[in-house]
Amino acid sequence: YKELDFQKKNIIIIIMESLSSEYVGALNQGKGHTPFIDSLMQNSLVFKNAFSSGLKSIEAIPSITASMPTFMDNPLITSNYAQNNFESLASLLNEEGYKSSFFHGVFNGTMSFDSFCKKVGFQEYYGLEEYFFGRWEKYRKMEDYDGTWGIYDEEFFDYYYDYLKTEQEPFFSTFFSATLHTPLVIPEKYKDIFTKEKKVHQ
C-alpha cells in the first residue's frame, strides 16, 4: 500500500454495542428501530454476512482495531499478552500523519479498554472521566450518567460530534457505544414515551 496514492481522508469507525440485526429495519424486512442507519445503508456498501472473531465486547475491540481474533478462553485485553507490541489501524495511520482517538462513555478502566487502546497506538482516549471533567462545561451533568455503565449514548454522541468538529485533520476515530448493554436503563426524558406493552427493556 505504500506505493499507492494514499488519500488522507478522515476515517470513523462506529461500534454499536448489542445492536442485533433484528433491530435494523434494512436487515429485517423493514421492521426495526433504526431509521437513520437504514437510510445510510441505502447508500453504502453493506455486508449481510460476516464472520465474528469474538463473542463479547472485550474481544471485539482487539479484533476490529488490531485484527486480533480470539484464540484463548481469556480475552487478549486482560491476558499477559496485552503488554505485547501490536500493529493496529491507529498505529499505521499515525505513521501517515493521522490524529487517532477512541471514545467509549463508560468508566475509564472498564475492561481495560483505555490501556489497550493506548497500547495499540490510539493517541487519545475519551471515557466518562473526560466527559465530566473535560473541556466543555455543558457536558458535566450527572443526569447524563445511566447509573450503571456510563454516559447515555445520545449525550455521548453529542459530545463526540463536538469533538470531531474541532479535531485536527486527517483523523482516525473510533466510537464504541454503551447504552444498549443490559440492564438497558431508559433516560428519564424517554420513560413515558412507551406504553407498558411496548417498553423495550421488559
Where are the model-predicted features located?
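Solvent-exposed soluble domains appended to multi-pass membrane proteins
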Residues: 1-202
